Amino acid sequence: MAKFKRILLKLSGESLMGKQSFGIDPVRLGEYAEQIKEVHEMGVQIGIVIGGGNIFRGLSGASKGFDRVKGDQMGMCATVINSLALSSALGALGVKTKVLTAIRMEPIGEFYSKWKAIEAMEAGYVCIFSAGTGSPYFTTDTGSSLRGIEIEADVMLKGTRVDGIYTADPEKDPTATKFADITYDEIYTRGLKVMDLTATTMCKENNLPIYVFNMDIVGNLKKVMQGEEIGTFVHA
């Protein structure tokens, strides 16, 4: 029995690079697809948002002289590329998917609407939401919060390369300790960088809990859905 009935899974674009320095690692992509298939077979309704940092990040583009709006639009296109790649990988495993885009770009994907997404998930499709919110100046984390709230997900699962939220960056501070659970207010107070402030506030105000875990370890997504405590639970 799965712990959650409907989830919004947020995946990092940079994680798709695997051991590469750019682009999509077919091995990592395949591992993600296998994990998603496992959970889908448990009867879980799945919505997914993938970042685009493995291809282009609007904010870093702006620091190099790109117009910020155009840079963010390039980042949106990067998320569409990643979404199509994941859709293809899932399709190869026999999982039905729909790529829904925040801006019109048929026939690459269908234009997003809440009702279309929920209907598709209830019919057994994995929905992949791409192009962020469709507007510049919003991160894919904010896009994930928005989509998670809209589709009435039970939780946002934030798959990262670390196994939860720590008192400090564990890659820089060996004394950092992990939280089993933490409130939104404590995240604010401690100044922890779980997501950007807009994304975190949206989740808090709309009672969407977040679970942060390491998606790069094969089998972890299923463990989360089975109720194993392998990450950090963020709640009101």
Could you describe each region identified by the protein language model?
Residues 1-236:
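C-terminal catalytic "cap/lid" subdomain
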